[in-house]
């Protein structure tokens, strides 16, 4: 097996897990994905998030654009952005999880990778990972201990525990830690709040959750 790796990043989940566990979010994505690949060839990295509304949150939109500009300069990384809709007057993500799961399965079906690494603790992705396994693919999960579903751990062939030690040397040079903010904003139905980088918040998932 050639072990071509495709990395799928739940941007909301990663942003808030970094903020809560490492108190900073200025991640060097090239070094991060290289460490996950561990010498295996990278097919491509896909980053998923919601596009901020410049009319509702102009500051958040500006900060997100700066963040996305950095991402788009990362080799072999594609940004996938979903939209927002109002739910009981509150903006929520629209279609991000479906977009990620569809890409993961579509690329598996077309044999574009041998190993899928999903950077998320969201148990909603467990079924997609199992389907990829059924196609003969290896699936790995990169997660924070405070934000992982048991179903994800059960389905994964291999697991990457993310913590402060893992991220040593993976931060972007010359940037200071961004202070935590508590502003309200667009969310997923189960993920209240938002981030300065434009990533809606992810609720912590108990390791006992299925």
Region spans (language model):
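Long, low-complexity, intrinsically disordered segments
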Residues: 192-210
């Amino acid at each position: 097996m050639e072990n071509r790796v495709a990395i799928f990043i739940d941007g909301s989940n990663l942003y808030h897990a970094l903020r809560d566990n490492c108190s900073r979010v200025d991640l060097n994505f090239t070094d991060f994905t290289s460490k996950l690949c561990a010498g295996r060839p990278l097919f491509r990295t896909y980053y998923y998030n919601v596009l901020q509304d410049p009319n509702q949150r102009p500051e958040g939109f500006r900060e997100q654009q700066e963040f996305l500009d950095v991402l788009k300069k990362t080799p072999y990384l594609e940004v996938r952005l979903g939209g927002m809709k109002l739910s009981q007057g509150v903006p929520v993500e629209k279609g991000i999880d479906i977009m990620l799961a569809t890409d993961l399965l579509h690329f598996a079906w077309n044999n574009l990778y041998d190993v899928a690494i999903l950077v998320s603790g969201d148990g909603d992705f467990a079924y997609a990972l199992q389907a990829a396994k059924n196609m003969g693919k290896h699936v790995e999960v990169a997660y924070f201990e405070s934000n992982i579903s048991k179903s994800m751990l059960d389905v994964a062939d291999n697991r990457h525990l993310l913590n402060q030690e893992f991220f040593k040397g993976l931060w972007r040079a010359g940037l200071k830690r961004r202070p935590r903010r508590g502003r309200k904003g667009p969310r997923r139905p189960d993920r209240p709040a938002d981030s300065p980088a434009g990533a809606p918040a992810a609720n912590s998932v108990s390791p006992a959750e299925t």
